[in-house]
Amino acid sequence: MTTNTSTSSTTDDLTTGAPNGTGAPDGANGVGGPTGTVGGPGEHPAYEAGFTESANGRVYTVTGSDWEQILGVGEEENERIVVNMGPQHPSTHGVLRLVLEIEGETVTETRLVIGYLHTGIEKSCEYRTWTQAVTFLTRADYLSPLFNEAAYCLSVERLLGITEQVPERATVIRVMVMELQRIASHLVWLATGGMELGATTAMIFGFREREKVLDLLELITGLRMNHAYIRPGGLAQDLPDGAERAIRAFLADMPKRIREYHALLTGQPVWKARMVDVNVLDAAGCIALGTTGPVLRAAGLPWDLRKTMPYCGYETYEFDVPTALEGDSFARYLVRLEEMGESLKIVDQCLDRLRPGPVMVADKKIAWPSQLSVGSDGTGNSLAYIRKIMGTSMEALIHHFKLVTEGFRVPAGQVYTQIESPRGELGYHVVSDGGTRPFRVHVRDPSFVNLQAVPALTEGGQVADVIVGVASVDPVLGGVDR
């Protein structure tokens, strides 16, 4: 192989057995059958390609350091490796697919592929009544279903013009169950994030306390998840007996658990090494990408809709908005831990504000008869109780039948309502054409928007830090794809 021979011509010579190959006697290379070498004058002997005739044809053997040159492979620094992470991957928080372009251990490009969990929730709402739509929307972000219910019902109540008619007790209970679910959501983030970084104790602790919160929500709503508890006009039912006592017991125990998390993780060298100065995104980057929630507050901007654009009477509660300045994964961890403590304060204030009263608006043309729920003593089954609630006239029975089967009508119009979910701004754009079903329901899910920050968080970093970046954003793919 001469110095002026190109790779392609050399390859052709090897493939076709061109005349520049020199034959060798049978067995000359210690192999039975004709053998030879391919090369030319002045070729370095270490770069010679030898061949052997066999029953299956000519077999070539390349020695030396020229394998990449013969194959035409580019320089090592120009190599491009594309790796798929997901959609079936334990560290992507659902069916999220990440297409990573890497050089060595450095990520040069991150592309997100979503849609694997699309269920058509928004479209399904257009074929159900205003109340039935809650059953679909509660399944969007399945780690914070009560926030989806609350944002949607607040939108419907604005269209109906009954925001001020919602009973105070119903509003207080709404705030209380939302803050309990905020704690549960952050505990899932702590548990899954700890598991992905190898902190299995954090996983056990996080899910242990989350079970306690889910037990409370099951006691109150009847279900651990996907509650359909918040309805247009109020709530599906009142608090059961013993709920307040169980919540107070949880409030007495949870602060000690949060201190345990700090003792376990905050000063842990490996935990800090994996998170400090990793996946940094400053406030300007968050604003440019539309990022909200703990990711934005960890960059130093105290934007919390409970304070900046209050709803459900949040302006009357005493609580702080935790922030940090570093904008890295460790700052997001600290912000979420502090938020759990602030949510405990709000729940405690809710218990102090609970007063006897209804949990549904008085307008029977809108409200389902929540009083028909079966109590622990069996009330709700007796004919006398049903007569008391429903009345005895045929008109009352007809009205109830039409309310449940056909639904109430909502005046034509459109509203956008946003609330602060565990992951950021959760917005609902609800459109009515004056009928008994929504004309359009669009969800501004915070996980969908926040995921757009993942390339900015991960590009230029290590492959191992991609897991940390996705975990620090805390996406829920049910809300992303819906």
Swiss-Prot record:
Q: Which Pfam families match?
A: Complex1_49kDa (PF00346)
Per its record, what are the GO molecular function terms?
NAD binding; NADH:ubiquinone reductase (non-electrogenic) activity; quinone binding
Localization annotation:
Cell membrane
Which residue ranges have biased composition labelled Gly residues?
29-42
Stored SUPFAM superfamilies: HydB/Nqo4-like
What keywords are assigned to this protein? Cell membrane, Membrane, NAD, Quinone, Translocase, Transport
| Record membrane topology | Peripheral membrane protein
List GO terms (cellular component aspect): plasma membrane
* Enzyme's top EC category: translocase
Compositional bias, Low complexity, is annotated for: 1-16
InterPro entries found in the cross-reference section: NADH_Q_OxRdtase_suD (IPR001135), NDH1_su_D/H (IPR022885), NiFe-Hase_large (IPR029014)
Enzyme Commission numbers on file = 7.1.1.-
Please give the residue ranges the record annotates as the region Disordered: 1-48
Reactions catalysed, semicolon-separated, are: a quinone + NADH + 5 H(+)(in) = a quinol + NAD(+) + 4 H(+)(out)
Complexes and interactors: NDH-1 is composed of 14 different subunits. Subunits NuoB, C, D, E, F, and G constitute the peripheral sector of the complex.
Q: Which family does it belong to?
A: Belongs to the complex I 49 kDa subunit family.
Q: What does this protein do?
A: NDH-1 shuttles electrons from NADH, via FMN and iron-sulfur (Fe-S) centers, to quinones in the respiratory chain. The immediate electron acceptor for the enzyme in this species is believed to be a menaquinone. Couples the redox reaction to proton translocation (for every two electrons transferred, four hydrogen ions are translocated across the cytoplasmic membrane), and thus conserves the redox energy in a proton gradient.
Specify the protein name.
NADH-quinone oxidoreductase subunit D
Lineage here is: Bacteria, Bacillati, Actinomycetota, Actinomycetes, Frankiales
State the gene name recorded for this protein.
nuoD
